[in-house]
Each structure stands twice: as C-alpha cells, then as structure tokens.
UniProtKB/Swiss-Prot annotation:
Entries under InterPro entries matching the protein: DNA/RNA_pol_sf (IPR043502), Integrase-like_N (IPR017856), Integrase_C_dom_sf_retrovir (IPR036862), Integrase_C_retrovir (IPR001037), Integrase_cat-core (IPR001584), Integrase_Zn-bd_dom_N (IPR003308), Rev_trsase/Diguanyl_cyclase (IPR043128), RNaseH-like_sf (IPR012337)
Positions bound to Mg(2+) 1: 117, 192-193
Cofactor binding remark: The RT polymerase active site binds 2 magnesium ions.
E.C. code: 2.7.7.49, 2.7.7.7, 3.1.26.4
Residue span(s) of domain RNase H type-1: 454-585
Name of the molecule in the record: Intracisternal A-particle Pol-related polyprotein
Site (Cleavage): 592-593
Classification via Pfam families: IN_DBD_C, Integrase_Zn, RNase_H, rve, RVT_1, RVT_thumb
Domain Reverse transcriptase residues, every copy: 52-240
Catalytic activity line of the entry: DNA(n) + a 2'-deoxyribonucleoside 5'-triphosphate = DNA(n+1) + diphosphate; Endonucleolytic cleavage to 5'-phosphomonoester
Originating species: Mouse intracisternal a-particle MIA14
Length: 867
C-alpha cells in the first residue's frame, strides 16, 4: 500500500508555540509492531490515510517505534490506538495544573450563558518538532513483500501522559486575550469545554465573536453544532439554569457489577455526584468496602444487600438533587450536621450551595466525633475560599457555646477552628425541609467517660498477656479468664469490656495499656471505621456498653516501674499482673516449696531449668517475675531492631519534617540496616504517591531491598503502596501502631541528618544556599566521609560483602543428638552464632567435594552458599 501525498495542509497554530516535553533520557526505544489480521490491517491503512490527509502525521525514519492497533466501537467504526507506555516511561510528567472540577453553584444567579466545545482539541495542538520522532509507528506489510511505511505524530497523540496537561495549558494561553479584553466576564475552562457567563447578554454577544477569532488564530476550532447560547445549558455533566444546578440523569446499572474494576467505575461516578447529594458518608460505606481485598482489577465482587440498599439511597437522592446558584450580594453560612457515625456539612444560602463530606476512609481506626466535626468545618471553610472566594459569615455546629469553649480547651482541632474562623459560631440551624434529615440524631458530646476520678466509684485493675490470659482485680478479689487471642492489646480490650459489663455502677478503671485507655476515652464520641481490623468489633461492643451505663473514669499506670507495690495505684495492678503471668496460681505443696526456693536463693534461670525440668522460656519468666531479680536483669542494647546481615536485605523508611525547607518540608528518609547507607528526598507531601517517588529515587541510587519496614502511617498502609511493593517484589512490614521503637534505626537517622543540616548550615550557607544542595552535602558526609571502627564508610559497606568471622565450629543437632561440622560461622550475635551447614550431599545429588560440583562451581568465589 502506498499513501497518496496530500497538500490539504492541516494548519497548526498560527500564534501558539509548541511546548517541548522534558525527557529523562535520549536513548531511542524500539518496540516491534504487533501482528495484525488482514481486517485490522485494512482498517489501520484507512485510518492512517485519513490522519495523513488532515495533516496530523508525517512520514518518518525515526529510531523510535511503538505499536499501534485498532478496536471496533459499538457503532461498528474502527478506532486507532497507539501504545505509548514505553514513551511515557521516558518522559518527566507535568504537574497538575487544575485542582479539580469548577463548582457551578459559584456562578451568579440569573446570569446568561454561552457554552462551547473545542473540536478535536488534542489534534489541534502541535507537538514540538524535536519531540515528534519519539511518537513514530509502523504499518506492517503483509508477508514483508515491501518496506514498512512509518509515520510520526505532529499533534498531541491520544495516550501520551502529558497530553491532557499540555492541552489545558495551550487552551488557557489562547484564552488570555479574551480574559484581558472582557475582565467582567466569568470564563470557566475544563479541558476542551468552555463556559462564558455574564449578567448582560449584550456583553456575551460582543465576547463570543472575539473568542472565536482568538481560538482560530491559535488553530482551535469549535464544534458549532454544540454551541449553547441561553440562560440554561449543559456543562460538565450538569444542567445549569438561572437559579439552580442539577446533575444530568444518571442510570445506575447493577447487571455488570461483577469485578473490582466495575465497582471502581461506579464509585468514581458516585464520588463525582457527592457535592450534589446530602447522603452522609456512613450510608455509602457498604459500597466503598468493595475497594478492599484483592487489588487486581478483575478480582470478583458480589453485590450485597447492604450495598444494594446504599445504591437505592443514591438513586432516591438523585431524583431531588440540586444546588442553588449563589447570590453575590448575600452572605452564606456553613452548617455542620450530626449525622450517624460521621458528620456532614453544607455551604448554605437559602439552599445548598455545596455539600461537603469527610473522607470515606479516615486515617485513624477511631474517629472522635467532636474532632471529626472540627475537621469537616475546616474543610468547609477551605472549600468556601476555594470555590466562592470568601468565607461564610456564620458557622453552625451541633454544640452550645459552653461546649464549644470546652472543646477548644481540650481538642487541638477545635482550638485551630476557633482561632482561624473570624465569624460567628452558633448552634441554630435554618428552618428548611432539606435540613430535617439530621435533626433525629442525638448530639454527640462526651458525658459517660469523665476526665477526673470518681470519688464514689469502685476501682478495678485490669491486665492482659500474650498467653491469652486476662484478669481484673476488684476489692482485692482476682478474676482471670482465658481468651482466644495472643495479642496483649486485644486481651486487655476484652478484659475492659468484661469489666464494663460486670460493674454498672460508677467505675474507675486502672490499666497498664496506654492504647486501651486512649481508645476507651475516644469511643463514646467516636466511631471505628476499619471493618478489616480485628479490634474493630471489640471497639463497637465497648461503645455500645459505654452509651448505656454510669460514668467511667479510666487511667493508665506504668507496669514494672520498680515502685513499691504498697503504693495504692500499684498494689491492685501488681495482683492483676501476677494473675496473667501465673504468679497467683501456686497452690500445691511442691509449687509452694519451689516458690520458697525461688524467693530465698534467687538463682539463675539455667538453675531453675535444670532443677525443675523447665523450658528456657519458663525459667526466664520465673526470673523476670521476681521483684528482686528483675532489678538486676541485663538491660538490652537500644539497637534491637532487626538488621540485615548484608546490604539490600532490610531497609527502614520514615518521614520527618524540616520546617526550614518550606514546601519541601516532608523529608522522606530510607536507611539500609546493615551498611547504614542513607537516602533522603525532600517532597511536598507524605501521600502514597510521594512515598513511591522516594522509593524509586532511593532504589535507583543504591539498589532495591528485599524487605522494607515502615510504621503504620496511612501512606504506607494504603492499597496503592501495597500494590507497588508487590509489583517491585519487595516485602513490606509495618511495626506496632504508635510505637516508634520498631523503626529505631531510621528514627535515629532523622536526628543524625538534622544535626548535620544544622552543623553544616553555619559553614556552608553562602556556598550552598539551596535546601536540596545542603541536604546532598549532609548525605555525602554521612555516606562517604564518616567511617566506622574498621575504617569503612557506609558507601563502602554498601558495595562490599560484610566481614564474617573466619572461624569453623562443630555443632550439635539436638533433635537427632548428632554432631556436625566443622562448619563456617556466618555471623555472631549476643549469646549465639549463625552457622552455615555444608551438607554431605547437595540438593542436586552431588557429593560435597565431587568433580561434578567442582565443575559447577568453577570460577565462583569460595564463599558459603546453599546447594
């Protein structure tokens, strides 16, 4: 097939200069063209000839190539697609230039509209000439009977990652003369959709031809059949009328909801509609739970009864959904409602201007309701400034003035809200039928859990252990129970639940678990939103019991503090602790004699083990439970985090804040636990996308680790980051929530890095004024200049095998009572060594020193390895 040459000449922009694309590398990428059937090849030839006539492509001899293919649309016509994924990987992506869809209720009430659509916007915007060879493709010839015809795009191709952003920037630049010529005109732009709005129709009639002329000069043409000139029109999926905005009718189909991808699309549509809907977030949770589980887009999902009921609520709400157009001369208010589980808010001016909802998946396991209201109010204030350019004059919340003062004194979120909002805070809602949906909910304010001990309340001490034994002490009586749990926190929660059910009178609870104390204090006015969490069910039961009982005071006492157990707050806790550890269970004469021996001689754990045929763990527990012996136990070294025995085995990662870096204050830090090599990235946030960016930068510099340990931050536990780790074949582990000791190595690295930034700033501030440069200098010092006791830097340790003891030992297999060795020591630890067992035969059946093995290992360094 030979294309016909055409001179029809697609006229690229007469004014606009093509924007160059930033590239990571200039190396050509060649992906061979896929095989196409004769039917598809014929369609490709026809579509390419059309693009050639329109001037969208040129013949090419580019060293780049990526495949093209065609798909048949429902109408029966073919669509040409270009697989540009390899090219997208080579380019630096532009940042977002538009934060989201414009809120149409911000359009003034009663103004006239003109709505237009730019025709073939991508194909009207030129590519920079130096970038065009990268977007080349090939039309294969049948049976290779002639050279293949090759072409490259002259305009923005579909499928290029930067095409949407470049389109927005290009059209925005083309509209600048219109904005300057008619400053009183409201002009909304989203991709290729444009809305003009003005109070006077004559002004629109003057602006419209000027707009057409300007767009034409930039090579942009409008679709004349889609122009809407009226006070009512369709724009961005909504019907805009003089006094209200109504979403277009959306049909929710249920027959195709079978996979995760189906639900992702459905929930995307619902999320787009949420500003129109007054449905509280809690009523949509059965739908958003479908996003959990298997992350593969084709993983099966089944529509449940609760999810179907949620869809029915959405359909019912859509029938009456509308937003009011704002009246510029009138003020508006922000109303925050006490809806079930999580609050709901609305910007109000004789009707809803914009519904505001909290995040469907909060970062915390327990959301305290008063804090959730303050956070949503702050979100509403930000939305008012963003979309309407001014703050509401009135904030309406479900709390009295006295309650607001109490919350401002005890809650950080309320303190920020009260000090940042200059208007009036009230609790009287407008009288309107739309707002009646929230009036049936009771005001959520803490009344059961008090902040001071109850003088007339009984005192109960609780404790739980990892053996599943939970106990509480009341009036000197010890009650213990075995639970089917192996987590001390879970057992402690179950014990507290048992106490709340048993003692209905005013109650003081003393627990040695700070986690449980904080949880109980939050649960009366909070909500657990993690159905996948094991503790969520227990929290819900505790919450139900709290809401139907007398006041409770719960406090924390530190266990094993070394203080005399005669102290009032410690005697009961000591009894509960002994009950969970077996200290109160000695009853037989033999056990009594053993206790006398223990309390008299205080011998070592090894002696107890040999004397009473105990295991090592049981013997050590006896020593640690002894009040006299525990004071003299060896203190473990602070560096108890698991470390890799060689580089790239175990990394730790965390985020610290350096306020002097400004917008780049979120400093992501990774450290290799074996070599100590450190990498840091100053970024603008700490979301999953920022964490992934840091990982890619760190791994490209120092290599990819096998295991990555982080804390339980929302970015690290997100589905997006978990999927990234699986794709990169990196095992991701998290530590205990709210326990930074599990990431002690990277926490110490934070302090070290900040120390060097401060020290070097004094000497190098004039030479290295930029934050990135000062950070690089600190990392260079830590990685390449600082040496250990052996004279090695972190970079040298990272790039070489760690030194191992050159020793051989014999060792005994206690299961078979046989001695083996001598075998080499891999690594020494405190009280133990790791030995590499060189077995007599290998997994391949060769003898240890056989000729076959010698042939297989020829040229391989003589280091221990598994065979």
């Amino acid at each position: 097939w030979k294309p016909r040459q055409t001179g029809s000449g697609f006229s690229l922009a007469a004014i606009g200069a093509a924007r160059p694309i930033p590239w990571k590398t200039g190396d050509p990428v060649w992906v061979p063209q896929w095989h196409l059937s004769s039917e598809k090849l014929e369609a490709v030839i026809q579509l390419v000839e059309e693009q050639l006539k329109l001037g969208h492509i040129d013949p090419s001899t580019s060293p780049w190539n990526t495949p093209i293919f065609v798909i048949k649309k429902k109408s029966g016509k073919w669509r040409l697609l270009h697989d540009l994924r390899p090219i997208n990987e080579q380019m630096n992506l532009f940042g977002p230039v538009q934060r989201g869809l414009p809120v149409l209720s911000a359009l003034p009430r009663g103004w006239n509209l003109i709505i237009i659509d730019i025709k073939d916007c991508f194909f009207s915007i030129p590519l920079c000439p130096r970038d065009r060879p990268r977007f080349a493709f090939t039309i294969p010839s049948i049976n290779s009977d002639e050279p293949d015809n090759r072409y490259q795009w002259k305009v923005l191709p579909q499928g290029m990652s930067n095409s949407p952003t470049m389109c927005q920037l290009y059209v925005q630049e083309a509209l600048l003369p219109v904005r300057e010529q008619f400053p009183s005109l409201i002009l909304l732009l989203y991709m290729d959709d444009i809305l003009l709005c003005h109070k006077e129709l004559t002004m629109l009639q003057k602006a419209y031809p000027f707009l057409l002329k300007t767009l034409s000069q930039w090579g942009l043409q409008i679709a004349t059949e889609k122009v809407q000139i009226s006070d009512t029109g369709q724009f961005l999926g909504s019907v805009v009328s003089p006094d209200k905005i109504v979403p277009q009718k959306v049909e929710i189909r249920r027959d195709h909801l079978h996979t995760l991808n189906n639900f992702q699309k459905l929930l995307g549509d619902i999320n787009w509609l949420r500003p129109f809907l007054k449905i509280p977030s809690a009523e949509l949770r059965p739908l958003f739970w479908y996003l959990e589980g298997d992350p593969h887009i084709s993983s099966p999902r089944t529509l449940t009864l609760a999810a179907n009921q949620a869809l029915q609520k959405v359909e019912k709400a859509l029938q009456n959904a509308q937003l009011q157009a704002i009246e510029d001369s009138q003020p508006f208010s922000l109303c925050v409602f006490k809806t079930a589980q999580l609050p709901t808010a609305v910007l109000w001016q004789n009707g809803p201007l914009l519904w505001i909802h909290p995040n469907v998946s909060p970062a915390k396991i327990i959301d305290w309701y008063p804090d959730a209201i303050a956070q949503l109010a702050l979100k509403g204030l930000k939305a008012a400034i963003t979309h309407f350019g001014r703050s509401p004059y009135l904030l309406i919340v479900p709390y009295t003035a006295a309650q607001v003062q109490t919350l401002a004194a005890t809650s950080n979120d309320w303190a920020v809200l009260v000090t940042s909002f200059s208007g009036k805070i009230d609790n009287h809602y407008p009288k309107h039928p739309i707002l009646q949906f929230a009036q049936n909910q009771s005001v959520v304010f803490p009344q059961i859990t008090v902040r001071n001990p109850l003088k007339n309340g009984i005192v109960v001490y609780t404790d739980g252990s990892k053996t599943g034994i939970g106990a509480y002490v009341a009036n000197g009586k010890v009650v213990s129970k075995q639970y089917n749990e192996n987590s001390p926190r879970m057992v402690e929660c179950l014990v507290v639940l048992e106490v709340l059910k048993t003692f209905l009178e005013p109650l003081n609870i003393v627990s040695d678990s700070c986690y449980v104390v904080n949880a109980v204090n939050l649960l009366e006015g909070g909500w657990s939103d993690k159905p996948s969490s094991r503790v969520a069910n227990i929290f819900q039961q505790i919450q139900l019991v709290l809401l139907s009982r007398s006041p409770v005071y719960i406090t924390h006492v530190r266990a094993h503090s070394g203080l005399p157990t005669s102290a009032p707050w410690l005697s009961g806790n000591d009894l509960a602790d002994k009950a969970t550890s077996g200290g109160c269970s000695l009853s037989s004469p033999v056990e009594a004699a053993q206790e006398i021996f223990i309390t008299t001689f205080h011998v070592t754990a090894e002696h107890y083990r040999s004397r009473n045929s105990l295991t090592r763990k049981e013997a050590r527990d006896i020593v640690t439970q002894c009040q006299s012996c525990c004071e003299f136990l060896p203190v473990p070294h602070v560096g108890i985090n698991p470390r890799g025995i060689r580089p790239l085995q175990v990394w730790q990662m965390d985020v610290t804040h350096v306020s002097s870096f400004g917008k780049l204050q979120y400093l992501h830090v990774s450290i290799d636990t074996c070599s100590g090599i450190m990498f840091a990235s100053p970024l603008t946030g700490e979301k999953a996308s920022h964490v992934i960016q840091h990982c890619l930068e760190a791994w490209s510099a120092w290599g990819k680790p096998r295991l990555l340990k982080t804390d339980n931050g929302p970015a690290y536990t997100s589905q997006k980051f978990q999927q990234f780790c699986r794709q990169m074949d990196v095992t991701h582990l998290t530590g205990l929530p709210y326990n930074p000791q599990g990431q002690g190595i990277v926490e110490r690295a934070h302090r070290t890095l900040k120390t060097y930034l401060i020290k070097q700033k004094r000497e190098l501030e004039e030479i290295l004024p930029q934050h990135q440069e000062s950070l690089s200098m600190a990392l260079f010092t830590l990685n390449f200049l600082n040496i250990d006791v052996h004279g090695h830097t972190a970079a040298e340790r990272q790039c070489s095998e760690p030194d191992r003891p050159n020793e051989m030992v014999k060792w005994k297999n206690v299961l078979h009572n046989k001695w083996y060795g001598p075998d080499p020591i891999l690594i020494r630890s405190r009280g133990a060594v790791c030995v590499f067992h060189r077995m007599k035969t290998t997994h391949f059946g060769y003898q240890k020193d056989s000729p076959e093995k010698s042939r297989l290992t020829k040229g391989i360094p003589d280091v221990p390895r598994l065979w």
